[in-house]
């Protein structure tokens, strides 16, 4: 598989400008310091409900996620990355605050991601590198679901106890992970 030439940040749902929300803009800026590497962080269509039927085609046709892409997905974006990798080859997925069910939430149910079983083996077959960040004190996601993603996908899990839903403004550990995937010194 060819070495990656870009990262794509797929944000969590909720709206707002992706480049100024949380760590997304900071990560984009840091990754673009790597020579010859591009990082896309675009506002997603349907940002509140984050419907699979809208997000996955956007990831394919507008963000051009392919086998030279590292998809960095946060929350709903992590779910989109996993569903995308069920049917598309990508270089890597980096999952931040990933989960496996609609959490009993009406908006999550409406997104369409949770209407069928996960195809864990297809994700692993289409994606040679899977890294995960999760925190036991996430106020929105039970640790059990984050651990299930780690177990089913055999991710390289970075487990924290104090990062909540990873809504900070910088994310140094993520930069280190992407650089290791690129074999660039940290």
Swiss-Prot record:
Keyword Hydrolase appears in the UniProt entry: yes
Pfam family, one: Ser_hydrolase
Tissue: Expressed at higher levels in tumor tissues such as carcinoma.
InterPro entries found in the cross-reference section: AB_hydrolase_fold (IPR029058), Hydrolase_RBBP9/YdeN (IPR010662), RBBP9 (IPR052581)
Alphabetic keyword roster: Hydrolase
Gene Ontology cellular component annotations, sorted alphabetically: nucleoplasm
Example of a GO biological process term: response to nematode
GO molecular function: serine hydrolase activity
Enzyme's top EC category: hydrolase
Cystine connections: none
Protein activity control: Inhibited by the natural product emetine produced by the ipecac root.
Other comment: Plays a role in maintaining pluripotency in human stem cells in vitro.
Subunit record text: Interacts with RB1; the interaction disrupts RB1 binding to E2F1. Interacts with RBL1 and RBL2.
Name the record gives this protein: Serine hydrolase RBBP9
Organism of origin: Homo sapiens (Human)
């Amino acid at each position: 598989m060819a070495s990656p030439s870009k990262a794509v940040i797929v944000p969590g749902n909720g709206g707002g400008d992706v480049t100024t929300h949380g760590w997304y803009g900071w990560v984009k800026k840091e990754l673009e310091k790597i020579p010859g590497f591009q990082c896309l962080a675009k506002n997603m269509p349907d940002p509140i409900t984050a419907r699979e039927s809208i997000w996955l085609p956007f990831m394919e046709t507008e963000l051009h996620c392919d086998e030279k892409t590292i998809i960095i997905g946060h929350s709903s974006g992590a779910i989109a990355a996993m569903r995308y990798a069920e049917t598309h080859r990508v270089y890597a997925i980096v999952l931040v605050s990933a989960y496996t069910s609609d959490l009993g939430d009406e908006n999550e149910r409406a997104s369409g991601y949770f209407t069928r079983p996960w195809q864990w083996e297809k994700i692993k077959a289409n994606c040679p590198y899977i890294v995960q960040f999760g925190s036991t004190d996430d106020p929105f996601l039970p640790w059990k679901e984050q651990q299930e993603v780690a177990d089913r996908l055999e991710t390289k899990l970075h487990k924290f106890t104090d990062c909540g839903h990873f809504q900070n403004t910088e994310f140094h550990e993520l930069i280190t992970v992407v650089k290791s995937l690129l074999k660039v010194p940290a």
